[in-house]
Amino acid sequence: MLILGHPLIPSARFVFIKNTDGIHSSANNDIVCFEAHPKNLELAKYCCENGVHFSVIFLSHKIETNTFFLFNAFKPLYCIFKDIKQAILAQQHATNYLLDSKILFSMDLNDTESWEICAKSQIDGVISKDSLLLK
């Protein structure tokens, strides 16, 4: 299981962006991230075509299956979920379709119940909710 955002475990810096200007102002080793909204598909395409490492954050409690697969066509490093049920569903899709993107659940890393749910559900990894400013 991947563990991102823990103070004792080194990981890349996640930078929330809203447009290509945000990409240009980020460092080369940053992972840019943005909301999984259809209006951001062009941003995902830009990242894919230009070799920019990016992640997509699914903020909704109801994942739109088409949105999930459309974003995955552009090969994000991570798909990050704040809703555990959506993370579990996405992990099933990622496993069944052999997607390259890793599924992460955004959580309080001190929440032992969430750790158990993620482990039992075989979620690819977790990310500290403090690493990202999720709405």
Feature roles, as predicted:
Residues M1-L77:
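Conserved N-terminal beta1-alpha1 strand-loop-helix module at the mouth
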Residues E49-F54, F68-L77, H93-F105, K120-V126:
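Glycine-enriched alpha-helix->loop->beta-strand junction motifs that scaffold or abut catalytic
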Residues N19, D130-S131:
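N-terminal donor/sugar-recognition subdomains of glycan-related enzymes
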Residues E35-P38, F58-K62, Y78-I84, I103-T112, ...:
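Glycine-rich beta-to-alpha transition loops that act as phosphate-gripper elements at the mouths
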Residues N66-F68, I84-A94, N110-D124, S128, ...:
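Catalytic cores of alpha/beta
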Residues G5, F16, F105-S106, I127:
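Structural signal for conserved beta-strand scaffold positions within catalytic alpha/beta enzyme cores
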Residues H24, L41-E42, E113, L133-K135:
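Short, surface-exposed beta-strand/loop "edge" segments at domain boundaries and coil↔beta transitions
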